[in-house]
């Protein structure tokens, strides 16, 4: 009789409507929040009277109180005559006394259209696919762009811009859940957005994560930095301003807080040689020596106190994670500088990865597979480059994984039901759709 009563209770539970389902046949999809990579954010700026340009032409907009697009750069701004002006406006200043980063004096910046997918650059193919699934911008589909020049810092160190972004992201995820019947959100991040998302999740209380985040889909999550991060600080490569002189490119790269987050971490890279010169070999274990060698001594303090502590270890985020990344693409692994030292062009030794991120870093999240309570799925995409996630082949696989994550199968409700029955062995007919 006791068994029959339990079966009857299960039948009643399975017949109940979904707790978060909207009336009138509304969508059962969980909301999706997109966190873009470094280059997929828009950045606007305006100049105030406090701006003192290095060259008069750079202050042409000064005092006009008009916003202009700082990033992505347009063709005119990238030309040789204008590139130094753009670099000046995009630079940050690290204040060692305040222990934080800020804009150059007189430059005010903002990230437009927060919460809307209109803010994203290059994500249209994925957005269209998600809309075809039933998502709508501002309804169950949101975006969390950010000022890619900044990052966050460990506890005890201020990070005004990064902390403000995390606060906005918290409110956005809570709002997305509220607008969708209390269903937790699926966070989809790419590249640098994965690093931010990971640190964001680790900074939220576990109860909050379990309540508001159903799943994190991480695309090209290089959670251990990458080799190009060191070369970028040495030469300024990857600044997006090819017409800027190399020394100015390097100064721009070194000014940005996020550049230090790109450096290979000791935990993931260990003693692997990343930069080799005539007299020295630099790995993730002697980054401070590398920073001194390239003349970036002012970067040592923020690296040691604000970056290294955040990446000494990779504790599991304790939310379900799908990690997707490309493999089998030639990826810079070691940069060998010749007689000219850091003034010259390095010879590049290649290894496996996605063309930008090294395989050892892309695989870093896989250590979570042995953590009790951490759900992890890894999807490797042969031949897919770092920026190739929105190509036709990769996009289909990305959408398929997101679709699995957002579908509102009541996993937690069923887990409770079967926990209720865990002392019995019998078969219950399960309706299609489970």
UniProtKB/Swiss-Prot annotation:
Is Transferase one of the keywords UniProt gives this record?
yes
The record lists the membrane-crossing segments as: none
Quick check: keyword Acyltransferase in the entry? yes
Q: Any idea which UniProt keywords this protein has? A: Acyltransferase, Transferase
Q: Name one GO biological process term.
A: lipid metabolic process
| Active site positions, chain numbering | 191 (acyl-ester intermediate), 354 (charge relay system), 386 (charge relay system)
A Pfam family annotated for this UniProt entry: LCAT
The top EC class, named as a word, is transferase
Q: Which GO terms describe its molecular function?
A: O-acyltransferase activity
Top-level taxon of origin:
Eukaryota
Family matches, as PANTHER family: LECITHIN-CHOLESTEROL ACYLTRANSFERASE-RELATED
Please report the name of this protein according to its UniProt entry. Answer: Lecithin-cholesterol acyltransferase-like 1
Q: Please name the source species.
A: Oryza sativa subsp. japonica (Rice)
